[in-house]
Amino acid sequence: MASYQSQRYMDKLTGEQVLIKEIAETNIHQDKANTGSCEIKLKDIFAIKQATDRLGAEELKPYLQFILAEIKLMKEQEDTLEAAASKLIELYDELMGLQEKRAVWRPVPTCTHVHIVIGDSFAGSMKQALIGLGCTETHKLISLRENYAIGPIYGLDLPEGRMARGDWFRNNITEAFEAYTEFETEYNELLDKIEQIPEQAEIIVWTSGNTCEQAGMRHALYLLRNKQNAISVNDACAFCEELYNRPNAYIEYRYSGEIPSDKLQKAIVQLEGKGKLCTADIAGLVREWKKLTEQTGTLRIWQDNDVLEVSAEYFDQYLLKKLDGLKPPVKDNGFLKSARLIGEAIGYCEQYIGDSYFEYRLRELIYDGVLEIKGVPAAMRYYSVRRKK
């Protein structure tokens, strides 16, 4: 069944590749006939492709909607060509400028601090916190974007290990195809950013009590193993819980991306210079990362202050129990929206796993005949499930 997802995305990719190839070939012929500036045109085409590839479907959707709305106005002659062109040029500049905004966070020779975070959500919060503190000139940011709780990490620091991880995600996680088409390129960019950290910069690796950030922290230290910089490891979740929680107002953060940027600012300031690791500490955590990359499983949990490998089916009974406890509308004949079930599972799960893994296991339970489906399993909002009768 996994091949269904893979083939669906292969068809999509093939169409994109054909389109890019046709555009490129058209420009080559035009350039040869006219200006001879083939190299510049091709460079522009692939710059556009790179800019859009780095955005998720939800990020791209508003741009597409705006473009279609402008085309509609032009067709109906409610907008002049000059006005429409001006708006589209502004949109183009904004979209292409996103790459330049990302470059602002790369380590530079004059920076004094480099923050390393795990996950896009926490990276966004950290950027807002650093902007709020007014220290973006000297404080830079590197994000490890992987969800280390799921998918194979065997040999992740080798090309074949990364290829295996990418293949698993493309075959099992619905929205992963685009994200893993340039996995190798992104990994090499990560290594470049690590290499660019200047000797004088203090490195702060942020983590918290979940598998994703704990394994990610160990991976970060492995990548930093040859750097001579001062390295600290800090837990913003633990800090914020201790500082802000009261008996009548208590928040337990499951991952750092849940922390508001204003509270994160306080953590950055007050944890400055704390959590320093000695050489032995770093060596121990590097060894732990190497052991993790010897495991062949696809699911890990955080338990007893350790990253533990568990079976892929570990959460199946938990999902089924949640399904049994929810009451679907009478009109739906016992079928429950999968998005509601997954939302319930995430809301009560002590582990930070992510909705994509729960959705993957839900589809596996359907394929195994444990559940019945109504709809199409293209994304969780498109189908409902119930126990097979």
Where are these regions (language model features)?
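A short, conserved structural fragment
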Residues: 366-376
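Short helix-coil junctions and helix-kink-helix linkers
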Residues: 340-355
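A short alpha->loop->secondary-structure connector
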Residues: 134-138, 219-233
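Short, cationic-aromatic polyanion-contact patches
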Residues: 376-389
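Long, hydrophobic/aromatic-enriched structural stretches that serve as scaffold segments
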Residues: 171-218
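A short acidic (Asp/Glu
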Residues: 124-129, 152-154, 213-221, 243-248
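A conserved mid-domain beta-alpha-beta active-site/ligand-binding segment of alpha/beta enzyme cores
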Residues: 249-332, 336
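A structured, charge-rich N-terminal accessory region that forms the first stable segment of a protein
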Residues: 66-69, 83-179
